Swiss-Prot record:
It catalyses: N(1)-(3-aminopropyl)agmatine + H2O = urea + spermidine. It comes from Thermus thermophilus (strain ATCC 27634 / DSM 579 / HB8). It comes from the Bacteria. Mn(2+) 1 binds at residues 105, 128, 132, 210. It is an enzyme of class 3 (hydrolase). Its main location: cytoplasm. GO terms for biological process: putrescine biosynthetic process from arginine, via agmatine; spermidine biosynthetic process. This is N(1)-aminopropylagmatine ureohydrolase. Its cofactor is Mn(2+). Mn(2+) 2 binds at residues 128, 130, 210, 212.
Length: 293
């Protein structure tokens, strides 16, 4: 059987990258199932070609270890978030680069907290269909609609790309707090403003990507799909630019809700694997075997 994200089994002690499954979705407000996202991505990753032609390298060669899923406590959001933060922190303190697989988008808050505790300050790049800036949703501050409100109040600089749904209060908050907003409709009309996005980010960046940033024609298996999303090429171009120009301290990919359409899981797995390869090239763990293809 092919192993996840490549053909090489990298022991934890030797791995540079830890893929951390976070199968938590207690805060979803529409379609359920994001708790099955991590397992579906890992299963799909077994079918990927280890060598990525576009990168001219095989990301598996950085040394990838898939950790055990983070446990969570039914009906106890605060305790579940504590467990997520502590598990991420454990891997970070061991010197690993962590890419987390959600789960709903509420998991980003404890993941980012763990990264700041371990690594210091950085800015946030949030790629999503939704702004996720509600102070609370359906009575909970731990909602998947609220993580970036909480992170803003904790002082994180925020850049949002691909947004298609945002209420008036969230827009006012974003303007007040200096959020750099690059909505999907502008990207479709004017092109992807990479130079502006890069200027808005700090030198060190944490990336959080909700799969519903992609158009539902490409990524139907999400909890809250919206038309008018980004293409796979636009997302890859964005990631390549950020990894090329910035130090990416960590990532999460969230909100895949498998519904039997396996092409969505394959797309998600390919995107995660590509990002790991970009980190490998950025950090010098990989070198391009082939240029100018």
């Amino acid at each position: 059987m092919r192993l996840v994200f490549g053909e090489k089994d990298t022991p934890y002690e030797e791995a540079r990258v830890v893929v951390l499954p976070v199968p938590y979705d207690l805060s979803l407000s529409f379609l359920p199932g994001a708790r099955r996202g991590p397992e579906a991505i890992l299963l799909a990753s077994r079918e990927l070609e280890p060598f990525l032609l576009e990168l001219g390298a095989a990301p598996e060669e950085v040394g990838i270890h898939a950790a055990e899923p983070v446990p969570w406590v039914a009906g106890m959001a605060e305790e579940s978030h504590r467990l997520i933060r502590e598990e991420a922190l454990r891997h970070l303190r061991a010197g690993k680069w962590v890419v987390a697989l959600g789960g709903d988008h509420s998991v980003t808050h404890p993941l980012v907290q763990a990264h700041r505790e371990a690594l210091g300050d950085f800015s946030l790049l949030h790629v999503d269909a939704h702004a996720d800036l509600y102070p609370e949703w359906q009575g909970s501050v731990y909602s998947h609609a609220s993580p970036f409100y909480r992170l803003l109040t904790e002082g994180f600089p925020l850049v949002q790309v691909g947004i298609r749904a945002m209420d008036r209060d969230s827009l006012r908050l974003a303007r007040k707090k200096g959020v750099a907003l690059f909505p999907a409709h502008r990207i479709h009309r004017e092109g992807l403003p990479l130079d502006e996005i890069l200027r808005a980010l700090g030198k060190r960046v944490y990336i959080s990507l909700d799969f519903d940033a992609l158009d539902p024609s490409l990524m139907p298996s999400v909890g809250t799909p919206l038309p008018g999303g980004l293409s796979y090429r636009q997302v890859v171009d964005l990631l390549e630019a950020v990894f090329r120009e910035k130090e990416v301290v960590g990532m999460d990919f969230v909100e895949l809700s498998p519904n039997g359409q396996f092409h969505a899981e394959m797309t998600a797995a390919q995107l995660v694997y590509h990002a790991i390869g970009l980190k490998g090239l950025q950090a010098g763990w990989l070198s391009r075997e082939v240029d100018h293809i």
